[in-house]
């Protein structure tokens, strides 16, 4: 059934987190980025339209500036992310070029998708880039985003951002790459008998209770934000796959119908 479901998928948003791009020692995982570029380029060659939502600016910045941990001051966090964003996009551009794929950068804040005029502008930008066969690479604009009681321009994390991008671009599928195999019925790091949920058809209280845990040293997203992203996909009749990003080539296996990760897809008439 999964292969049949994905045959009609045209537009795909792929989200990769910092933990999938940065090694445990803080160095950049060049091999994984190369594999990701290969997969996306292969999908483009097959007629798919792909948007990449990529975290990693902080991780790249920490590596470039030889910093062992994330600064505590907001201004310094923004500075590190600003440096890292340039380094990350430079590397993406170089590696994608090996596969004859052109990329672009779109940096967003929440204000952009809240106000109708700016939302229309960014939507048109996405459509123009896609029509030219370009892969938009999206990240939150950390250098200018603020999170204050009277005015917040932050999305919270890139899990949520990826679902918002999928919504405004009317993507058919969101593929979320993470450092976990999918959604389990309970925390697999604590319970040895935790079982992977292969298919989720609705976001219930039980599903929400399965989610937990904060982000890693480099990233901010946890399981709950991924569940919320799946709910957002459901709201516009989209679907989502949460899978381990250890080998980005697994994306191709999933789209061929192999059961990996957790597939979030509501049951429709004719599916039962």
From Swiss-Prot:
GO terms for cellular component: cytosol. Pathway: Amino-acid biosynthesis; L-proline biosynthesis; L-glutamate 5-semialdehyde from L-glutamate: step 1/2. ATP binds at residues 15, 178-179, 220-226. It comes from the Bacteria. Its EC number is 2.7.2.11. It catalyses: L-glutamate + ATP = L-glutamyl 5-phosphate + ADP. Keywords: Amino-acid biosynthesis, ATP-binding, Cytoplasm, Kinase, Nucleotide-binding, Proline biosynthesis, Transferase. Its main location: cytoplasm. InterPro entries: AceGlu_kinase-like_sf, Asp/Glu/Uridylate_kinase, G5K_ProB, Glu/AcGlu_kinase, Glu_5kinase, Glu_5kinase/COase_Synthase, Glutamate_5-kinase_CS. Gene3D superfamilies: Acetylglutamate kinase-like. Substrate binds at residues 55, 142, 158. The keyword Transferase applies. GO terms for molecular function: ATP binding; glutamate 5-kinase activity. PROSITE patterns: GLUTAMATE_5_KINASE (PS00902). It is found in: Cytoplasm. The keyword Transmembrane does not apply. Catalyzes the transfer of a phosphate group to glutamate to form L-glutamate 5-phosphate. Belongs to the glutamate 5-kinase family. This is Glutamate 5-kinase. It comes from Streptococcus equi subsp. zooepidemicus (strain MGCS10565). The gene is proB.
